[in-house]
Amino acid sequence: MASLKSAYTQPAASAAGAVNWNAPDLTRHPPRSPRTRLGGFVHLPRLIDKARAVAAGTNGDFHYNCPMDQRFWAFTGLKPGPFMQQVKKGRTDSELLAYVMANLKPKRSPSEIKAWSAWYEQQAPDNPDSRGFFNDVHRKNAAQRKDIETWFDWLELDDYVTFGGKP
């Protein structure tokens, strides 16, 4: 069996045709993996994909400003509304990263961003309610998988299975 991480990079929906990341249709394919980094930040490319899809009305079941996004806002000191305004102006990934870096509160060093990203990538459910939700989806999607431990593992599995992959 291929590893989830290698399989996720080519989900069935994306492999069937090119994906337009400037206007992603999240009814046809998932956003980028939460592990994908931009400027050292994990989750930022995924957050951008969801924001662009919401702006285009093609977000499907994906939510902008979900609890995972809120952890990014908490670390950066940014707010979802002004960030969405930048997305709606058609900013590129690089321009959105420049916006993030210019508006960090407090300012963060590259080593702080790297440390936060490493920490965030390893986060697992931390209370009974979130653990129950996590376990329910894990059980439904791939109960036999023993390597699904973190929220990022869970998101990648859910995205992959939702868009036609076999766990």
Show the residue positions of the predicted features.
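Amphipathic protein-protein interaction modules
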Residues: F83, V87-A142
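Polar/charged low-complexity regulatory segments
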Residues: P11-N59, W119-P167
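Generic alpha-helical structural element
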Residues: S33-T36, G40, D61, F72, ...
